[in-house]
Amino acid sequence: MYKRQGFFLAFSIPAGLGTAFLYPSIQSCAQKWYAGRKGLATGVIGGAVGLSGAFLTLFVRAALRGFGPVQGIRGAFWALGALTLPVCLAGSAVLSDPPQKKQQPSGKNTLDLSPGQMLRTKQYWLCAGAVCFSTPAVLLFSPIILKLGMERGLDETAALWSIVLGSVGSAAGRMLMPMLSDHIGRRATDLGLFAASLGLSAAFWAARGWWVVVCYAGLTFCYSALAAVLPALSTDLFGLPHAGVNYGFLALGQSVGSLAFPFAANLLALENGRHLLAMAGAAAGFAAIWALHPVQKDPR
């Protein structure tokens, strides 16, 4: 019990807070430098985040087997900490906003809503709801994907590929779809992703063998792409000056979904019901984005 509490205090809370402060700051800064290509700017960052999942999976498994001075999970934490600290410090030292004139392309982002103003718009609640409903398609299955793969005909090595290719799918979704959204629009991109997530969730229910890996990789592509399009969608709707804080409030939808849906699935002891919950979430997210339209004026 005390070890668990110590882990939360020493790692989970500091790591969670650090990510919460760092990631929105980087995303909002990148959008200000590339205000005309916000999807590209955030997509490159998101792609790096997605690829980190594949690296961490392979690194931790290697650490558990042991290599050099890195032995076991404790050694993996020490090694990752030693790598992360200088990289993040160096990146933070050079991070700065561009001159004001570079931040605003002509005719765009005429609304500059503060967080308080944003929270009074229905667009905020539709966006946050869509983000929340994007989570069950992946987060209901990511903790059990190895077990699920083996139950459906894969051996342990093959089932491990669902994690690796899922990370590749995540990286591809985070990089490619925000770039596509620069050309076809954020709303159209999100509608397509939710529709694909709904179809893949249905296919995942019946998948066996390597189709489990294929469907899961597709779902991680859609889930991560939806998350990666969000920063640009946020600034399109609510403006750039408060981009970091506004994005943080929108990302609360993801936090709610990542806690609520797995909790409900475990509480109700859902097995096949997880697939129904994932499909319902994708359909609800599609409906929320379908109802989403630009903010017409500053809410007072």
Whereabouts are the PLM-identified features?
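Hydrophobic core of transmembrane alpha-helices in multi-pass small-molecule transporters
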Residues: 6-21, 132, 211-225
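A late C-terminal transmembrane helix in Major Facilitator Superfamily
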Residues: 44, 53-54, 237-270
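Intracellular juxtamembrane helix-capping segments at the cytosolic ends
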Residues: 20-34, 41-42, 225-238
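Structural signature of the two symmetry-related core transmembrane helices
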Residues: 188-203
